[in-house]
């Protein structure tokens, strides 16, 4: 039954994506499209909401309206997208153009008039009469706002809901040459709780990967007892770009049955904060390594994720051998596969792990701790999962560590 539901979900996803117009929009640039950032890419505290298109390390390239429409928003800022344009199109979608150097003469004149009126360089404007035609030059590419180098940020949204949609779904994928498979640089296996062991450890264990004759990868064998989950560090490459960009989709299987999946097709802005639960945030905080978890301990509202009843976890039992398969895709269908052999650990000799905190916080409860000079209040759902914290006070200074 679960397999049928999973297949139906995949078919529904394909039907929804097929509904997006593939030839309605043109490229915003007249140069070969190479990417320095992909849709859904993992960024600090958010998912990347569009494509970052390389402009060959220069500014001043003509930026074109992707289709007929009306400019509904103009923003000038010293951070974020810098100088940005938002064009609503009659088919219900909005395109966004960010990090611009300069607007076209007509738009620039309107913006300057409003800046003088407001006596401010930074403005956010909502015009209703600035119409554009497909192929009009609307701006010059730049490096404004929070940009790390010259490029164009190009984005698609549903005009009515503001939901962000992968630009590849609108035909952008046809403009990008990509014959390279994603790369899985690291793979880790995690004990889910204190009663679980992985390779005789209660701490996460790194697995080695060996490439096989058929192009797939075989991970080192896992001996486990109890519930376990996996996480990977991965990136995508394209044919004409050296950037390590974000991957599009991950799907996992246990002995052939669907286990867990996430796919960067679309998401809403208020979902973006959940990136810190999709990744191993503690590892990122300490080592600056982004490992994407292939499991969830507590349900949370992230539409990108789908899984089975165990939320991606594997319950390793005696007298059963398991093969855990991971498939990592880019939008062009290039795929990397890792197979992980797993057996039940009959001999349990555990290595020591670091001590737990002095307070155990459950995500579905609230807490109030009073010290001599300070008070700590932790509301319900302050954490994505149960956590042990060391909380102490010294000379009126509160110290909280996980």
Label every model-predicted segment.
Residues 349-352, 356-359, 387-402:
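Proteolytic processing hotspots in large secreted/extracellular or virion-associated proteins
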Residues 1-24:
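Bacterial Sec-dependent N-terminal signal peptides
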